[in-house]
């Protein structure tokens, strides 16, 4: 089983990506895009791993087990730079640092690979710094950019990149993959539905009962708000559980990555790490610290998006549209809530939540935003 098998994509799209990653001379710049739940970020990372995979047969690249793949996935490969930001915008200094790294020749792999997420946060003044490097990179450098959609990226940048637009997997396809991985059919369908087609989230829900219970109950907090104090309590509980969920996800992944890296380097757990290898371990630790903060903000954003599914279910019941509910497990509670509010009120809540989600993506004060939103449900 290779890394490519993780991705739930149309067969033609997946085959094309595999061929492109193993080509003698791949395109120098790529733009991976997809809506929330689409695997564009994971696909870009797997593409990077395949570019630096050590398998001699091009058809086998992206194996997921060689040193090249493992160190790309955990961020410790010396020829791979994985840039993500918590800031509202990507700074000129960030861009200049990436441009400098792009000039370095590969030290162990075939390519110097720069994976730049959050490209939609790049203002025009920053894009001007990157433009030349992306348009005419050194022959050994490949740029991989990610964003929610092509239109989120300045035209001067996206016009220089080969586009890879990936769809959100169908819920049935995500469920089928979970079943193939040994998950019971009903649980697989339930997890895939709650995850809204996000395969990574669905897998966690299917294998972690505590995470599944949090997902089933957390978005329903809004239905029990009766006072300002209960609104604050709901906001605090949502934030606390999102932080806990993120910490658990990061811890499990961090330990797995450290174990894999030590095995690749030939180091037994607890043994002294030689100075020549310590830099790779430190690089992994630094990457994990940066990623932990991002996981926390992404988890909180996802928690608020899950509340959005509750509001849409309520609106579905109020309008009697007959559409399937995303939170079918809570139909009775949703019906009771729908009966004591109006469709107009629910629509106002949906619109307010869209504003909150937009501001959360710009690193605004999450607690203030969520407390304000919860306060809307006070009767």
List PLM regions with ranges.
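Catalytic acidic motif of RecA-like/P-loop NTPases
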Residues: 117-123, 128-135, 151
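Conserved catalytic/switch belt of AAA+ P-loop NTPases
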Residues: 103, 128-145
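P-loop/Walker A NTP-binding region and its immediately flanking N-terminal helices
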Residues: 1-119, 124-125, 142
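Charged, glycine-rich active-site and insertion segments that engage polyanionic ligands
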Residues: 1-50, 68-71, 139-141, 148-306, ...
């Amino acid at each position: 089983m290779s890394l490519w098998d993780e991705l739930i994509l149309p067969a033609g799209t997946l085959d094309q990506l595999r061929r492109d990653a193993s080509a003698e001379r791949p395109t120098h710049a790529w733009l991976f895009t997809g809506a929330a739940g689409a695997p564009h970020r994971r696909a870009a990372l797997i593409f990077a791993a395949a570019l630096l995979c050590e398998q001699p047969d091009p058809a086998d690249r992206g194996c997921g087990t060689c040193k090249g793949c493992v160190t790309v996935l955990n961020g410790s490969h010396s020829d791979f730079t994985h840039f993500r930001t918590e800031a509202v915008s990507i700074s000129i200094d960030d861009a200049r640092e990436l441009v400098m790294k792009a000039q370095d020749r590969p030290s162990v792999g075939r390519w110097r690979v720069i994976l730049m997420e959050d490209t939609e946060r790049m203002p025009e003044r920053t894009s001007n710094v990157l433009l030349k490097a992306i348009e005419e990179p050194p022959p050994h450098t490949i740029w991989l950019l990610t964003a929610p959609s092509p239109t989120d990226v300045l035209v001067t940048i996206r016009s220089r990149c080969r586009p890879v637009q990936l769809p959100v997997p169908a819920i049935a396809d995500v469920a089928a993959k979970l079943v193939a991985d040994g998950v019971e059919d009903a649980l697989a369908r339930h997890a895939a539905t709650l995850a809204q087609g996000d395969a990574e989230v669905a897998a966690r829900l299917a294998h972690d009962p505590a995470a599944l219970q949090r997902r089933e109950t957390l978005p329903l907090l809004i239905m029990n708000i009766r006072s300002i104090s209960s609104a604050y309590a709901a906001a605090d509980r949502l934030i606390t559980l999102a932080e806990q969920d993120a910490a658990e996800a990061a811890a499990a992944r961090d330990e797995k990555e450290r174990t894999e890296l030590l095995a690749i380097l030939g180091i037994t757990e607890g043994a002294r790490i030689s100075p020549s290898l310590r830099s790779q371990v430190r690089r992994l630790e630094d990457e994990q610290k940066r990623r932990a903060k991002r996981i926390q903000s992404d988890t909180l954003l996802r928690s608020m998006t899950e509340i959005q599914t509750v509001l849409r279910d309520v609106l579905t019941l109020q309008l009697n549209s007959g559409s399937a509910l995303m939170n079918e497990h809570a139909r009775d509670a949703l019906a009771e809530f729908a009966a004591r509010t109006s469709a107009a009120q629910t629509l106002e809540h949906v619109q307010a939540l869209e504003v909150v989600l937009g501001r959360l993506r710009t690193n605004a004060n999450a607690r203030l935003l969520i407390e304000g939103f919860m306060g809307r449900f006070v009767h």
